[in-house]
């Protein structure tokens, strides 16, 4: 019987007994990425606690530079109002103004999702939406913004608050060009708006990403990387309109809105979500390698959806995309 051979173990594959520090806590493939998170008015307490715990344990401030969301007011769009209704704004003694100020003091901008696809001139005097707008604009924080779809609302806000940044909502690019968006179309948006949320289908359009990269304007775009909708969904625009219709028709004065489950409403069979009917199809959620590919084209701002997601889902996305994988990601759920 031959003696057993001893196999040399390479120590460079063993984990260190000390955690990374500084930027070492971030995903090593995308270290300069900054993030825009769907937590405003929904996951505020959880995000504040997470940021504070991370700073205490790792002496590092995570690169979350913006949050987005909105109460269920008439101008809101993109998502239904389930979570907004579940979390009243005074649940911790906070008002919208206090929350925005807390974010701004942390170096985090706030973006309202004023992305209703069906607004007309007659909706511009909505008191609840204007109330929120006035609060946001009065903070005079350069990172605050509104995400818009309808030109009439964009023009109205630009006239009232010319210094308030505007972002192009995914709802707008879906409404304008529901099936395929061109580089020329995106260029036209860059001429009018400060920032553009890149349609999640377009994260996989390598020719378009290269054109944007070559234009030198990648810093104006914010790709959405964890969109759970079916890739190339053919009824996305119908879903957005259904949500918007529910917002407009569900208003009962100030912040009193009825809630509509637009995905499963039997009277609207044309807008039943393909995720339910065809679960075998891939979603727009990017793999880590796909995320790195977008990053390598020069994009540095990235969006995490979260307005209709539980907090655990947001933590999962932090651990998947933002954090270092060997040491830090697995600790995310312990903070």
Positions of the model-derived regions?
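Active-site pocket-lining/capping segments in soluble small-molecule metabolic enzymes
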Residues: 2-182, 192-335
């Amino acid at each position: 019987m031959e003696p057993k051979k001893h196999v040399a173990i390479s120590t460079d594959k063993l984990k260190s007994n000390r955690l990374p520090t500084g930027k070492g806590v971030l995903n090593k493939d995308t270290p300069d990425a900054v993030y825009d998170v769907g937590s405003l008015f929904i996951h505020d307490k959880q995000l504040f606690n997470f940021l504070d715990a991370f700073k205490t344990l790792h002496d590092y401030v995570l690169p979350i530079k913006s949050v987005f969301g909105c109460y269920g007011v008439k101008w809101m769009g993109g998502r239904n109002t389930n979570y907004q209704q579940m979390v009243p704004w005074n649940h911790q003694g906070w008002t919208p103004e206090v929350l925005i100020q807390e974010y701004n003091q942390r170096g985090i901008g706030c973006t309202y999702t004023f992305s209703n696809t069906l607004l007309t001139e007659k909706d511009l005097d909505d008191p609840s939406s204007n109330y929120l707008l006035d609060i946001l604009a009065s903070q005079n924080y350069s990172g605050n913004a509104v995400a818009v779809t309808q030109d009439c609302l964009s023009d109205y806000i630009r006239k009232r608050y010319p210094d308030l940044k505007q972002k192009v909502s995914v709802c707008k690019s879906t409404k304008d060009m529901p099936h395929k968006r061109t580089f020329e179309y995106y260029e036209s948006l860059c001429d009018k708006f400060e920032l553009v949320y890149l349609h999640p289908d377009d994260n996989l359009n390598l020719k378009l990403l290269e054109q944007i990269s070559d234009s030198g304007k990648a810093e104006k775009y914010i790709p959405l990387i964890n969109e759970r909708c079916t890739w190339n969904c053919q009824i996305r625009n119908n879903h957005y309109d259904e949500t918007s219709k529910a917002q407009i028709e569900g208003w009962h004065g100030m912040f009193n809105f009825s809630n509509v489950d637009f995905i499963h409403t039997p009277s609207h069979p044309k807008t039943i979500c393909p995720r339910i009917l065809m679960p075998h199809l891939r979603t727009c959620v990017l793999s880590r390698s796909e995320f790195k590919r977008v990053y390598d084209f020069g994009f540095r701002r990235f969006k995490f959806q979260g307005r209709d997601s539980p907090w655990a889902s947001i933590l999962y996305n932090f651990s998947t995309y933002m954090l270092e994988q060997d040491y830090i990601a697995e600790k995310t759920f312990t903070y």
